[in-house]
Amino acid sequence: MKRSLSILALAAAAACAPALAQAQDGIIRAVASGPAESPPNGSPGSSVATFDIEGNIMTADVPFRDLLSGTTMAHIHCCTTAAFTGVAPIAIPFTDFPLGVTSGSYSASFDLSDATIYDPAFLAAFGGTPASAGAALIEAIASNEAYLNIHTTQYPAGEIRGFLVAAPIPEPATWGMLGVGLAGLGMMARRRRA
């Protein structure tokens, strides 16, 4: 019993650690839906996309499903004038996004220091260099002013969209609670030995 309790505590700590570490690496999520579009629509389509930003590399993983018609394009828009609202120009087009499908997945990596990944109008509007465009995009993501948009034939202005939001970073209290819990388990195990 004592040994299984210790193993259980160790397993719980190991299970929590990767999730907490991953959140600190620059993980961004976008939960896209029809009601989040501008204007809102009744599409049952959805996506829970993940963007991982490490240095100048942004990796996108965009699964999507239940769209009402075939896809025509997808991209990241930036920079709205207020968080979680408004429309903005295209910042990064997904040039190889799967077209004509109602569900699927898209994965790609973007080098934010490469001018060719940006829409030319976005690049020009934000300083004309990849460094300034990338800085504007990162600032907009931090301010919740950038969004993912998937367009379809039925909704050419966009069937589903979701604002990019930083995944929650655990507060120091989370680690403290984990430490207190493990210490408590250790004390219980020690008591039972005596």
Task: Label each PLM-derived region with a short phrase.
Residues 170-189:
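A short, hydrophobic C-terminal helix/tail in secreted or cell-surface proteins
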Residues 1, 58, 73, 177, ...:
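Detector for methionine-enriched segments
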Residues 191-194:
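Short, charged juxtamembrane terminal tails flanking transmembrane helices
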Residues 2-20:
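Gram-negative bacterial Sec-dependent N-terminal signal peptides
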Residues 21-74, 78-168:
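Metal-centered catalytic cores of metalloenzymes
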